[in-house]
Amino acid sequence: MFYLFFYWQNLHRDELYSDSLLSNYNLTRLYANSESSNTLYSNDFFSILNANSNDNPILGIIEIKAINVYYPFFAYYSDENLKLSPCKFFGPEPGKVGNICILGHNYNNDKFFSNVNLLKVNDEIVLYDNLQNSFHYFVEKVYEVNNSDFSPIYDYDKNRMFLTLITCNNVNNNRIIV
């Protein structure tokens, strides 16, 4: 009985958190990833990045023009955050030396990282921070790993800025790594 109450309490807390994020940041209005839209709502995105920057759960914006991706990403991972937008899973803030790892669900071409498997070597990925600084990364490789393999997070030159994107391969439960 206690377990069920605890589970319900956590579920209710997570739902309230999701509702709060959606109402405070209106994330669904901001997404411009539909095929009919060529507009990137950068003014809206940058206004949410600048608002309450000390407690802002949004760390930045990820843009991948080659596959029409333009999303805010959360400063930290949680199951609730990941339902709403990509999340920083590991590493430094954008523009810092190290490997910033961003997770995004694969919603089969509807949103988030559905098409990262289509990226090619040298495709550009841009991260924007809350000061509107842009940090440019270029795809070095796209590959799959077993869903329990976290080695791509740690496999990088410690003296450079790296970005690793991770999403699910919805066919065989592997992870797609960029």
Tell what function each PLM region has.
Residues 1-178:
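Solvent-exposed, non-transmembrane regions of membrane-associated and secreted proteins
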